[in-house]
Amino acid sequence: IPSIDQEHLSLVLGKHYVISFQDRIEGDVFDNLRKRVNNPKSRLRKFRSDYLFYALIDSVVDGYFVIMEFLKIRIDDLENYVLENPDQQVINQIIAIRKQLTMIRKVVMPLREAVDRLFSDESDFITEETYLFFRDVQDHISHLMGSFDGFRDSVGSLTDLYMSNLSNSLNVIMKTLTIFSLFFVPLTFIAGVYGMNFQHMPELGWKYGYPMVW
């Protein structure tokens, strides 16, 4: 399962500016946004700084939707693998996805709190029109949280299904071993009887005794 890269991001909104602080500036969720900024006809060049501030946060949220779609596909694939071939590799992937979901939730929660705080504090730098855009971002984050929680439940169900299939496989093996052991019970009994050191065993003098045992 591919790893999910993390990066620290800070945004500062002023009346006529937005300042961003991040670890790297290439290959991130803002690549498409940079192209829009460089386009003279782009809405980002015509609107105020608060709209750019919104666009940056919206790009981050959209990036999580890409991750969500990827994880959905992986969970669906793992469900088929668990049913067909519940081996150790499958449970390792289930554990890896569960860790990723936990990590993502820890990252999305502060973002949700930050967006909620924009509404409770009502910044003078954000217009009423831009607040409507932020309302959509708020809804998208809530949808993300619900989806990731649902995925976490699905991963828990996959773990239970894996353990159930593994238990069934062990039961089949035990039944097979039991059948083989029942087959050897008479042989073990005969070997035990004739392995005893009794002084008088009449059948030992029978000429067909040895062939009958074999």
Q: What residues fall within each predicted segment?
A:
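Hydrophobic alpha-helical transmembrane segments and their immediately adjacent juxtamembrane loops
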Residues: 139-214
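Peripheral, non-transmembrane regulatory/ligand-interaction domains of membrane transport proteins
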Residues: 1-128, 133-136, 140-145, 150, ...
